[in-house]
Amino acid sequence: MGNTLTCCVSPNASPKLGRRAGSAELYCASDIYEAVSGDAVAVAPAVVEPAELDFGEGEGHHLQHISDREMPEDLALESNPSDHPRASTIFLSKSQTDVREKRKSNHLNHVSPGQLTKKYSSCSTIFLDDSTVSQPNLRTTVKCVTLAIYYHIKNRDANRSLDIFDERSHPLTREKVPEEYFKHDPEHKFIYRFVRTLFSAAQLTAECAIVTLVYLERLLTYAEIDICPTNWKRIVLGAILLASKVWDDQAVWNVDYCQILKDITVEDMNEMERHFLELLQFNINVPASVYAKYYFDLRSLADDNNLNFLFAPLSKERAQNLEAISRLCEDKDLCRAAMRRSFSADNFIGIQRSKAILS
């Protein structure tokens, strides 16, 4: 009535309609803005029929949201170890077959374990290694991650691959690699040498190695491919490239890796990174619970394959440092619990904070 201008839509055209309705709502709003922008009084538009707002088959109205790409609906997230903390990691399950066969062979052949190299704690002495979930040991972590990649290749289900990761179509060196090379699984030491070279040259951290393994298993699950002799180098390179950009707090450029691998081009690196992200559906999030699960599963893998961490007796100084850090965490939990309740300023001031000694 009068100068009041209204726009009527179907009852279902509400903000809860979904993201597909967004384009139509903006289109209707733009018509209103053009109508009221002039000085003359515009005629109120007619009621839009529900048939005109049919978004089911419209091709140009669908705009996928970033959250939809991060959590794909067609994947069972509870069974995907790279997304769900309760799902078992793929590399650990693939390694169990070899571990059981090795133990059975040693039992049948009466192979003695030899001199015990693992140190056990007692009442008077406690042995700890220098690796924690927040600060893993770089050398041991890279060894465990490459061992996990080795089991992925050795116990793969098939040879499903994509052209972008095929080293025969996109070689990493100018020298021609013989076809016989792609018929044999690489040894663990060869994989370790390749990954160690990248980590040493790019100065990457141990946490980046764990995230690399998370992205690798996420790629294999999302894209439904296998890591095999023809694609393992480019898949590992793409996972390291993405993990170094997401995890490490430093500027990493694709050209930096081109200086490490002399014969690869920047265009090839850019294309591989783009395909890697698209296959991950841009889900680069790694929750803390998933990261911790991969860390402890890597420790279990190291223990099963006699890749022991370097243990040392717990000294008094280190015990004090660990106690200070633990007390600091407890005080933070108390502060969070106290903030949930209403209390006076005197009680708030009375909360003590301990100084942590970081080694």
Curated annotation (Swiss-Prot):
Alphabetized Pfam families for the sequence: Cyclin_N
Modified residues (Phosphoserine): 67, 105, 112, 344
One GO-annotated biological process of the protein: spermatogenesis
Main localization category: membrane
Domain spans labelled Cyclin N-terminal: 145-267
Residues spanning the membrane: none
Subunit composition and interactions: Interacts with CDK16; this interaction mutually increases the stability of CDK16 and CCNYL1 and increases the kinase activity of CDK16.
Xref: CDD domains: CYCLIN_CCNY_like (cd20540)
Key words, A-Z: Cell membrane, Cyclin, Differentiation, Membrane, Neurogenesis, Phosphoprotein, Spermatogenesis
GO cellular component assignments: plasma membrane
Functional summary from the UniProt entry: Key regulator of Wnt signaling implicated in various biological processes including male fertility, embryonic neurogenesis and cortex development. Activates the cyclin-dependent kinase CDK16, and promotes sperm maturation.
Protein name: Cyclin-Y-like protein 1
Lineage: Eukaryota, Metazoa, Chordata, Craniata, Vertebrata
Gene Ontology MF terms: protein kinase binding
UniProt-annotated location(s): Cell membrane
Family of the protein in this entry: Belongs to the cyclin family. Cyclin Y subfamily.
